[in-house]
C-alpha cells in the first residue's frame, strides 16, 4: 500500500502534516512569555487555527497553561462565560475533586461535571442566572482564572479564536467590561484571533472602542516560501515523485503563497500524478482549473447572489488581481466606475465573504481559485 496523500486541507492539520510556521510561533511564544495581549488578524485559509493549536503544544512544553476557546461554538454570553471559566480552570487544575469544590464556590455558575469509565473528567459549567446577569458571570470567571493562576504560580494563556464574533453578543458593553478585567490581571496573556478582518480592525483601531491599543496587532501572512518548498519537496520525495524546482515555484505563484491554496494544489497534484510519479508543467497549470471545476456549485451560488456591477467588478479583479480598484487606469481599462459605485460593490462583496480587505487596504479574493472559475468555467453563465 502506497503512502497516503500527505497534503491535508480544509481542517485542522497536525503533526508531520503541519507546514513550517516557526517564526510566527517563536514570536507568539515570546509575547505570551511576557503575558501580553496580541490581536492576531488573518484572512481565512491562512492556517490560523492550525497555527494556534501548534502554539498551544509548544507553550505547554514550556510549562505554561493554555485555554483555547472558539467563539463560533458559543451563541451567547452565558455559554461563553461557562466555557471560559471551565477551560481556564481545567488548564490550571486537573484534580477532579478540587475542580468540583472550586466550581461549587461560584456565585453565578453551577457545576456540571461528567466522568468517563476511565475516570477522566469532562467539566462544563451552566449559568444559574438570567441572561441579564450573564456578563457578571463572565467577569467572575475571568477573575477566578487570575486568582487560580496566581495561586498555582503559573502563567496562563487564553486564546479566543474568531474573536470578531464578540460583536454578536451585546455590542460594546462586553468589550469595555473585558478590557477592564484584563487590565487588572498579571498572570494571564491573551491572543485574540479573527478572520473577519474588517470587524477585527474596527474593534482595535477605533479610538472610541474598548480594545483600542490594548495590545499589538499581528498580521498572519503567507508561510515563508523557502521553508514551505522544503516541506512539499520532502513529502514528494517520500512518495517517489519527481518535480523540477522551477515547476514547484509555479505552484506557489498560482496559490499566491496562501497555505490552504498550496495544500490543495499539492493534494490534487499528488493524486493526478500518482500513476507516473512525474509532475510536469502542463499538469501544474491544470491544477487550479481542476479545483475550480470541483468547487463550481459553490461559485455559481456566489455568482447568482452578486449584482451586475459586482459581477463586472469581479471579472475585472480576476484579470488584474494586483491593481488598485480605485485607480483611474483600472476603471478605464475595464469600463467601470465611478469610485463610489466601486466602493459600494467592494463593501458588499467583503461582507459576503467573496473578497477580503488587507491591513494595507488592498482587496483580494477570499477563495484564490474563484478567479480561475470566473475566467474559464464561468464564461458560460456571464
Predicted regions and their residues:
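C-terminal leucine-rich, beta-strand-based interaction scaffolds used for sensing/assembly
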Residues: 2-5, 246, 293, 297-382
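P-loop NTPase nucleotide-binding core
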Residues: 36-37, 41-46, 50-157, 188, ...
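Sensor-1/coupling segment of RecA-like P-loop NTPase cores
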Residues: 150-157, 165-170, 178-208
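Short, locally clustered residues in the helix-turn-helix/winged-helix DNA-binding domain
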Residues: 32-33, 256, 270, 315-322
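Alpha-helical sensor/transducer elements of the RecA-like P-loop NTPase core
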Residues: 50, 189-190, 194-236
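A short, basic N-terminal segment
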Residues: 1-38, 43, 372, 380-382
Amino acid at each position: 500500500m502506497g503512502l497516503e496523500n500527505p497534503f491535508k486541507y480544509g481542517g485542522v492539520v497536525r503533526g508531520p502534516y503541519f507546514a513550517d510556521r516557526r517564526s510566527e510561533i517563536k514570536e507568539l511564544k515570546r509575547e505570551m512569555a511576557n503575558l501580553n495581549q496580541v490581536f492576531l488578524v488573518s484572512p481565512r485559509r491562512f492556517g490560523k487555527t492550525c497555527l494556534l493549536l501548534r502554539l498551544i503544544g509548544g507553550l505547554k512544553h514550556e510549562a505554561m497553561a493554555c485555554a483555547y476557546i472558539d467563539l463560533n461554538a458559543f451563541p451567547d454570553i452565558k455559554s461563553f462565560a461557562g466555557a471560559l471559566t471551565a477551560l481556564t480552570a481545567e488548564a490550571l487544575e486537573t484534580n477532579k475533586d478540587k475542580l468540583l469544590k472550586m466550581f461549587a464556590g461560584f456565585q453565578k455558575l453551577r457545576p456540571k461535571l461528567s466522568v468517563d469509565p476511565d475516570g477522566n473528567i469532562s467539566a462544563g459549567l451552566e449559568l444559574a442566572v438570567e441572561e441579564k446577569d450573564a456578563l457578571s458571570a463572565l467577569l467572575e470567571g475571568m477573575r477566578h482564572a487570575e486568582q487560580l493562576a496566581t495561586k498555582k504560580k503559573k502563567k496562563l494563556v487564553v486564546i479566543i479564536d474568531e474573536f470578531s464574533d464578540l460583536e454578536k453578543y451585546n455590542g460594546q458593553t462586553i468589550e469595555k467590561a473585558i478590557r477592564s478585567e484584563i487590565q487588572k490581571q498579571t498572570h494571564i496573556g491573551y491572543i485574540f484571533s479573527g478572520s473577519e478582518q474588517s470587524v477585527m480592525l474596527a474593534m482595535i483601531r477605533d479610538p472610541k472602542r474598548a480594545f483600542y491599543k490594548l495590545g499589538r496587532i499581528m498580521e498572519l501572512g503567507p508561510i515563508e516560501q523557502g521553508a514551505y518548498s522544503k516541506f512539499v519537496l520532502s513529502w514528494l520525495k517520500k512518495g517517489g515523485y519527481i518535480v523540477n524546482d522551477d515547476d514547484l515555484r509555479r505552484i506557489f505563484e498560482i496559490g499566491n503563497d496562501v497555505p490552504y491554496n498550496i495544500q490543495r494544489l499539492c493534494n490534487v497534484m499528488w493524486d493526478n500524478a500518482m500513476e507516473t510519479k512525474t509532475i510536469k508543467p502542463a499538469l501544474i497549470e491544470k491544477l487550479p482549473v481542476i479545483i475550480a471545476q470541483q468547487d463550481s456549485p459553490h461559485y455559481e451560488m456566489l455568482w447568482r447572489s452578486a449584482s451586475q456591477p459586482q459581477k463586472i467588478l469581479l471579472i475585472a479583479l480576476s484579470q488584474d488581481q494586483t491593481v488598485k480598484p480605485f485607480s483611474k487606469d483600472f476603471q478605464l481599462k475595464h469600463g467601470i466606475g465611478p469610485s463610489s459605485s466601486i466602493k459600494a460593490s467592494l463593501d458588499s462583496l467583503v461582507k459576503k465573504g467573496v473578497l477580503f480587505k488587507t491591513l494595507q487596504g488592498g482587496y483580494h479574493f477570499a477563495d484564490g481559485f474563484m478567479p480561475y472559475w470566473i475566467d474559464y468555467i464561468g464564461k458560460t453563465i456571464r
